[in-house]
UniProtKB/Swiss-Prot annotation:
Signal peptide: none annotated. It catalyses: chloramphenicol + acetyl-CoA = chloramphenicol 3-acetate + CoA. It comes from Clostridium perfringens. Homotrimer. Transmembrane segments: none annotated. One of its GO terms (biological process) is response to antibiotic. This is Chloramphenicol acetyltransferase. PANTHER family: CHLORAMPHENICOL ACETYLTRANSFERASE (PTHR38474:SF2), SLR0299 PROTEIN (PTHR38474).
Amino acid sequence: MKFNLIDIEDWNRKPYFEHYLNAVRCTYSMTANIEITGLLREIKLKGLKLYPTLIYIITTVVNRHKEFRTCFDQKGKLGYWDSMNPSYTVFHKDNETFSSIWTEYDENFPRFYYNYLEDIRNYSDVLNFMPKTGEPANTINVSSIPWVNFTGFNLNIYNDATYLIPIFTLGKYFQQDNKILLPMSVQVHHAVCDGYHISRFFNEAQELASNYETWLGEK
């Protein structure tokens, strides 16, 4: 997958990037509820799983916008990937640990769903942190905390503040006013992502969840 270098001197985000990366290092998170009433009903009718469906929605929106694909490469150069693949957590009930498994993204949901099922079949019972080798650099991290319908979630990453890729966390869905809602938290780096961008993410994720008939397809 191609990594496109960014010319910082000719980049409209240069002053914001330098300020929030160097002067005032700043990451932040936002949590919002996604309504999944119709989506949940439809995937149950089709015998599909909710988790990979939500992973697909997240990755689809990420791949629409460069700010969610911007990062430093292994040489420390700034740029953005053409597209991203999801790396997601799978819980092991027997020993209360989890694995992180990555799946190749496909904009066609049935094909992505098939890829997910194959990876789950091959790796979900392997009690390793990262049982599937060869994880590419162009991945986003998705995790699930399906035991709590939280109202806020924050990750504290202690490094040199150069991790620019967003991190997504899903909570337990619940019913409110005849609607099924699911909390979703997104952690971003302010150097590459502002409030407008993260708000657009939530709005587009909700749009996909509401208009599931346009992409869900046949099982």
